[in-house]
Amino acid sequence: LHLLSRRQRQMCIRDSPIGVFLVLYLGLGILFEYVMEIPMGFDNVPIVVAFLAAILTACLQNPKLHFDQKLEVMAQGVGDKNIITMLLIFLAAGSFVGIVGRSSAESVAYCMLSLIPARFSVAVLFVVACFVSVAMGTSVGTITLLVPIAAAVSKASGFDLPFCIGSVMGGAMFGDNLSFISDTTIAACNGQGCKMKDKFRENFGIAMPAAVATLIVILILSFQTTIKGHVSQPYNLIQVIPYVLVLIGGVVGINVFLVLLIGIGSGALIMLIGGYVEPVEMLVRMGNGVSGMFETCMVAILVAAMCALIREYGGFEALLGIIRKAFKGRRGGQFGMGLLVGAMDIATANNTVAIVMANPIAKEMAAEYGITPKKAASILDTFSCIFQGVIPYGAQMLVAISAVNELGSQISAFQVMPRLYYPMFLLISSLIAIVGVKGRRRRYRK
């Protein structure tokens, strides 16, 4: 801070609510996970409480504004069209995933494993994880479903267990980055004000080369392994139809609400007519799916309120000033945006929260450096995916390790990390995409 002017130092102090949140969340997470050795310690940190403390800090600042005025500023921030849209999409996506359940994803995996030779089992796991996560919109959900299958493949075929787990995690992050119903996509697109299909096309050119490179590496390593056997389980592909409809609808550019309604309607009909669930159980599943999004919605609301106050105080100007000094031109602006969301993700271990927190700063950076909304949304989603995919204390890694341990095997995050090929290739692909940007810095105009 000593390198900044007095005015910039004052503005940095106005950014302190973000610092309060990071200290509380990261500090408690490290305490729970590594000192007290509580399993999945970061998930035990009350993130909503940490954000409430940050908002309280923001409310105590700037005595020139009365408390009622601060409430009005926060209400205007929460009532923003993009925030409301994001919340509604979160809830609709939760309802869709709740209806279809885990059986559809398992059917895709077992179908492909039964059709393709055992030597290609790990490659199949990666491709299935890509498809399932794009369809479901959740990397953690995909990992939860496919890690037991990956463990079974490892045991039956002789493939290295970290190799199988790392391939599933890589595929899960591919879909989390591209899916139309992923909370990261929803947060990035609504925060930057771009259409999901535009962000998808922007991301696709970065993610697909990384996925192809990952698949090639997996195939090369697969041919160096001695195969012992294969996995065979029953499956039902009819239950996959809702996922396919949602995927097609998103790619062709149908409104995301309409796409989700189609998915919810088709999923409900298939599950009821096929006799897979009773009507009451269907409603319970929908409720559980929506409930699973409540914390994400609360975080979005609290971050919107906190950032509205910080913006009102002029706090973001200091961060932008630091970024302007460190990064020059459009390429520099994109690097800065990627590092910003990456730092937020390292601190919070949650890529959705990282994007929501970075959104307001990134939007001002986009205007400053002449970065289009779809490019800004793509950078936020991609770099948060890269960092989230490799940190050893992220939900994805912790869920994978926990699932393997429950199955009676022992594995550590540091055994899996060298096998996370997709995030590594995604970083390379992202850097190439940024370095390839042409043109001088210019302010973006809608």
Model regions: which residues?
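Hydrophobic mid-bilayer segments of alpha-helices in multi-pass membrane transport proteins
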Residues: R14-L26, G41-P63, M86-A92, I149, ...
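Membrane-interfacial loop-to-helix junctions in multi-pass transporters
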Residues: V45, D80-M86, Y110-V127, S154-C164, ...
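Interfacial loop-to-helix junctions that mark the boundaries of transmembrane helices
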Residues: E33-V48, Q76-K81, M112-P117, R201, ...
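Alpha-helical transmembrane segments of multi-pass membrane proteins
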Residues: I89, R119-V132, G158-G175, G332-D345, ...
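Single conserved hydrophobic/aromatic residue that forms the stacking wall/gate
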Residues: L1-R9, I13
